[in-house]
Amino acid sequence: MDFFSQKKQSTPLPARIYQEGENGAVGQRTREMRLVKDRLLELSDQLRAPLAMNRRQFLQSSCGLAAAFLAMNSVFGPLFAVNPAEAADPEESAARNRFLKEQLIFDVQTHFVYPDYPATNILGLRRLAKRWNPDLQGRQTPEDIHFDNFYREVFLESETDLAVLSSAPNDDPEQWFLHNEDLARAREKVKEKSGKKQLYSHAVFTPGRPGWMDDLEKAIALRPDAWKGYTVGQPIGESQWPWRLDDEKLVYPAYEKMMKAGITTVCIHKGLLPSNYKKRMAGTWKYGRVDDVGQAARDWPQLNFLIYHSGIRTGGVPGREEIRIFEESGEIAWVSDLARIPEKFGVDNVYAELGSVFAVSAVSAPRYCSGILGTLIKGMGEDKILWGTDSVWYGSPQWQIEALRRLKMPEDLQRKFGFQSLGSASGNLKNRIFAENAQQVYPFPSI
């Protein structure tokens, strides 16, 4: 299949962080989102006139992006570092952009699907994201999640320097996002376009499926940069083939092959279940927990286990009850379990990846998002957190990059739970998360 034909696309910078969803419904954070939207429109009308911009031009500018964070601060409290001058003066905004231009960004989770991919439900994520990303307004089409748009949104419309292309299996082979051969081809195609290694690729392994060990051998020949596995069998809906990381009989022989092949980074989708997971995945949801990570990591210290989505239990906007529990106890379902693994099992080869868990919480419940980061950093160490965006499901990752650069740790959470400050946009901690930690598991290219 040829998924590399190019189209000319427009490239506006995401600016408007919130937008009402279909029929005005935006889930459990509706009131806050509407307040942010109203404040942003008010700010834009105040600030755009001296700049001789219409509303759309302003919201798609760097000043508009700064105004969006000011609007969020007005609703959620001072959770994002933003100078009001950035929203009023293009030179102030440009100066900040120049200062951060050299910051390295390594996104360890990106996606697209092959052209004939039959399911359209994945477009629902882009429909969700259009609440905060204006580039996604209007009808979403299958082409939006194909290679052309992937390359444009990740490498041209954002400051992402390096990325990892991943995939997901399905019991129906036609519904894999990409097969392993496609992943390898995409890596080489991007290298041809850029003249250097800019895209890394996974190979998916599927314990328990007929012929899966033979497929693993074939994948080794493709020389993937890392492995990707789904212990629930497939991300949505029940699979015939769930499995556990610590299954000595089924999975440990595969680890042996991985180790001998010298491909020792094992990425595992955990959590991110649908809200009705106990019904929709009644027989398999328990395999999405992180209770099998510690033993496998202890038994295989030669391997690095990267837990994608940080194991967060569900993938939706954080609900009031989840936020209440966190504020009272510091617990975040399954994320806290993951954060306890290094101390509980005495391991240092477990990492937390931020794809989707950051995207969904940063702009809908930023204080809770800070709590997720604080929990992971405290339990796992600041050298074990990896930047991932799950793009192109949410459009260009630039808005996520800006959100992490600006996100702050509330002082009361630092006192109550012992969380550390997140530091400045280009401070040591955020530089580690954005790229330096990834170098431990994905060697940087020499050119």
Regions found by a protein language model. Name each.
Residues 1-53:
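N-terminal secretory signal peptides
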Residues 45-53, 73-110:
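C-terminal segment of N-terminal export signals and the immediately downstream linker at the start
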Residues 53-73, 91-95, 104, 120, ...:
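Mid-to-C-terminal alpha-helical segments outside catalytic/metal-binding sites
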Residues 106-110, 163-165, 199-203, 227-229, ...:
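Hydrophobic faces of well-ordered beta-strands that scaffold small-molecule active sites
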Residues 111, 168, 204-208, 232, ...:
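Active-site beta-loop-alpha junctions enriched in small/polar residues
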Residues 152-159, 180-196, 216-224, 256-260, ...:
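Acidic (Asp/Glu)-rich catalytic clusters
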Residues 170-288:
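Active-site gating/metal-coordination segments in enzymes
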Residues 241-387, 413-415, 421:
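Catalytic pocket-lining loop regions of alpha/beta-barrel enzymes
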